[in-house]
Amino acid sequence: MSGSFELSVQDLNDLLSDGSGCYSLPSQPCNEVTPRIYVGNASVAQDIPKLQKLGITHVLNAAEGRSFMHVNTNANFYKDSGITYLGIKANDTQEFNLSAYFERAADFIDQALAQKNGRVLVHCREGYSRSPTLVIAYLMMRQKMDVKSALSIVRQNREIGPNDGFLAQLCQLNDRLAKEGKLKP
């Protein structure tokens, strides 16, 4: 591929780390990374009173499953709370194709934000790799941000570290959206 839009995983890693190449782990269980969109971990996702206090109307679990790498919630878990749920059975591995879920996740986030007081929590086990990747893809696809801008906005509001496979998928999305003229100039 050629073109000025092409970015590397290293370019994105440089935005995520400090000058010495160190990464920070999340200091809070949950952060509002852009208006009405929160990224968080399993503990906040499983704390329905806390979600209600935050005004969360929708929960997107980017790590649905029963293993130690996943968060074992489902629509039934939230049914009496009035919270709308979507689960994605994603693994936090470089080989996992999270981009296959970008559109579905973006539709769900849009559904939440279309409600007058809608707020969405996008979470995974730690709120560090899978869930921020989905929010970054959303900002690119629906708010026409390039990958560096979207990643920077999320990183300014939460310590994140998507794995290199997810960063590569975001670079591919950036190249595709740029070629289609779907990013802000």
Curated annotation (Swiss-Prot):
Which Pfam families does its entry note?
DSPc
Matching Gene3D superfamilies: Protein tyrosine phosphatase superfamily
What GO molecular function terms would the record report? cytoskeletal protein binding; MAP kinase phosphatase activity; phosphatase activity; protein kinase binding; protein serine/threonine phosphatase activity; protein tyrosine kinase binding; protein tyrosine phosphatase activity; protein tyrosine/serine/threonine phosphatase activity
- What's the Enzyme Commission number for this chain? 3.1.3.16, 3.1.3.48
Name under which the protein is recorded: Dual specificity protein phosphatase 3
The family database entries (InterPro entries) matched by this protein are listed as: Atypical_DUSP_subfamA, Dual-sp_phosphatase_cat-dom, Prot-tyrosine_phosphatase-like, Tyr_Pase_AS, Tyr_Pase_dom, TYR_PHOSPHATASE_DUAL_dom
Record carries keyword Nucleus: yes
Describe the reaction catalysed, as an equation: O-phospho-L-tyrosyl-[protein] + H2O = L-tyrosyl-[protein] + phosphate; O-phospho-L-seryl-[protein] + H2O = L-seryl-[protein] + phosphate; O-phospho-L-threonyl-[protein] + H2O = L-threonyl-[protein] + phosphate
Q: What is its main location?
A: nucleus
Record-annotated Tyrosine-protein phosphatase domain positions: 28-179
User: Which organism is this protein's natural source?
Assistant: Homo sapiens (Human)
Functional description taken from the UniProt entry: Shows activity both for tyrosine-protein phosphate and serine-protein phosphate, but displays a strong preference toward phosphotyrosines. Specifically dephosphorylates and inactivates ERK1 and ERK2.
Q: Name one GO biological process term.
A: positive regulation of mitotic cell cycle
- Highest taxon of the lineage: Eukaryota
Q: What is known about its subunit structure?
A: Microtubule inner protein component of sperm flagellar doublet microtubules. Interacts with VRK3; this interaction activates DUSP3 phosphatase activity.
UniProt keywords (A-Z) are:
Cell projection, Cilium, Cytoplasm, Cytoskeleton, Flagellum, Hydrolase, Nucleus, Protein phosphatase
Q: Active-site positions, per UniProt?
A: 124
Uppermost EC category? hydrolase
